Amino acid sequence: MAINAQEISALIKKQIENFQPNFDVTETGVVTYIGDGIARARGLDNAMSGELLEFSNGVFGMAQNLESNDVGIIILGDFYTIREGDEVKRTGKIMEVPVGEALIGRVVNPLGQPIDGLGDIKTTATRPVEAPAPGVMQRKSVSEPLQTGLKAVDALVPIGRGQRELIIGDRQTGKTSVAIDAILNQKGQDVICIYVAIGQKESTVRTQVESLRKHGALDYTIVVTASASQPSPLLYIAPYAGVAMAEEFMYNGKHVLIVYDDLSKQAVAYRELSLLLRRPPGREAYPGDVFYLHSRLLERSAKLSDDLGGGSITALPIIQTQAGDISAYIATNVISITDGQIFLQENLFNSGIRPAIDAGSSVSRVGGSAQIKAMKKVAGTLRLDLASYRELEAFTQFGSDLDAATQAKLNRGRRTVEVLKQPLHKPLPVEKQVLILYALTHGFLDSVPVDQILDFEEALYDYFDSHHEDIFETIRSTKDLPEEAVLNEAIQAFKDQSEYK
């Protein structure tokens, strides 16, 4: 058999031309230490800060400390199956979470994976967990109210869309209840809500989710949870994952309300990670950048300019204090970043004043400009009246004789405190809040016994619902009060036909 050299040569040339090198270049390193949610790896010389790294068991980590001889990694998942000597490789990506409408109504972990047993989340859109906050020219001043449905908040410390309002207080003072009520009140307001539970007991989160479901609020709410049993890296990352989901809606011109419950636990988780990564401790053993931890998170809440669609993220961060000390390190940090705070006091809570808002220490730095005209008119002097009542109340404990004017102030003050009380999970529409506050400030409640104020309030709403729905409609549509004579006549007519004469 004759061998044709030219044919063989042509065949070899063809094979060389068609040769496809089938190999993948990845930079890999070796795990040198593993434990407590962090790892150290050698050999990842070109890793970037915040880059996602993949371990041989499929779990991801995030590069945090870039040192001369190794890389400190926080592990975003189960670290129990990782061993010293395992391979870890660079991905060239930063951490992203799934975002979009498909997440609404779901309970997810900080990685965006569903944990509610309702199947996969069908979305292809993702956003980076760490993103720059909108710049000065991309923002617009807060001008629209975000009604919480709580009389004490909407009248005394109003919140506007795009504001950051801190809820601060000791444990068991109703901080979460204020935030959940604010979420419940967004029903039908075209606001998407995100509740981020950080370091909570799983039973507590379950209770909150059931409460949201029962009131129909899950239809517009996403729950992101990193429970107390999860590793610190997930607690640290949870708020950033929540705000990344919120940004998707904000940049599409929608309004979002996000609750961080609570940032004290996130700071503790970050302290734990930093100490394990051998970063130098500062005050109370927190790392030096603990202020930046919260400032870069809360600065991502904004009211966008009209050019960018006018969307907004309103943030309600929660901080837990000890023995009412609002001058603690993390508390003062977050107070200085936010646009005001709602301070809840244990002694008010225990004496039955709920929500237990301390009007003297609570403030809203920007929300006043977002209040509707009607609320501004009826709540204008409320804060001062309440403050002078507290002062007089302390003074009267000495038992001195009081003149008629002082007695009248005390009587009005007691009724004000009573009117600002509200049952749990029963937010009020703004027109009803305006009505009862108008009745209070114009003396219609002065003759009603203090212990009957709440009954009077319910009866007044029922009467106006059936006889004067037009007045409610006027407040809703014009955002202003109807003529005083009309309102006075309607309230007086109710009093005349009721037992509260």
UniProtKB/Swiss-Prot annotation:
Organism encoding this protein: Streptococcus thermophilus (strain ATCC BAA-250 / LMG 18311)
Subunit structure: F-type ATPases have 2 components, CF(1) - the catalytic core - and CF(0) - the membrane proton channel. CF(1) has five subunits: alpha(3), beta(3), gamma(1), delta(1), epsilon(1). CF(0) has three main subunits: a(1), b(2) and c(9-12). The alpha and beta chains form an alternating ring which encloses part of the gamma chain. CF(1) is attached to CF(0) by a central stalk formed by the gamma and epsilon chains, while a peripheral stalk is formed by the delta and b chains.
GO cellular component annotations of the record: plasma membrane; proton-transporting ATP synthase complex
This protein's encoding gene: atpA
Site (Required for activity): S362
Main location (coarse class): membrane
HAMAP family in alphabetical order: ATP_synth_alpha_bact
Upper classification of the organism: Bacteria, Bacillati, Bacillota, Bacilli, Lactobacillales
Keyword terms: ATP synthesis, ATP-binding, Cell membrane, CF(1), Hydrogen ion transport, Ion transport, Membrane, Nucleotide-binding, Translocase, Transport
Gene Ontology molecular function: ADP binding; ATP binding; proton-transporting ATP synthase activity, rotational mechanism
Binding positions for ATP per the UniProt entry: G169, D170, R171, Q172, T173, G174, K175, T176
General function of this protein: Produces ATP from ADP in the presence of a proton gradient across the membrane. The alpha chain is a regulatory subunit.
Protein family (similarity comment): Belongs to the ATPase alpha/beta chains family.
NCBIfam families associated with the record: atpA, PRK13343.1
Compartments reported by the entry: Cell membrane
Keyword Protein transport among record annotations: no
Protein name as catalogued: ATP synthase subunit alpha
EC number, as in UniProt: 7.1.2.2
InterPro entries: ATP_synth_asu-like_sf, ATP_synth_asu_C, ATP_synth_asu_C_sf, ATP_synth_F1_a_nt-bd_dom, ATP_synth_F1_asu, ATPase_F1/V1/A1_a/bsu_N, ATPase_F1/V1/A1_a/bsu_N_sf, ATPase_F1/V1/A1_a/bsu_nucl-bd
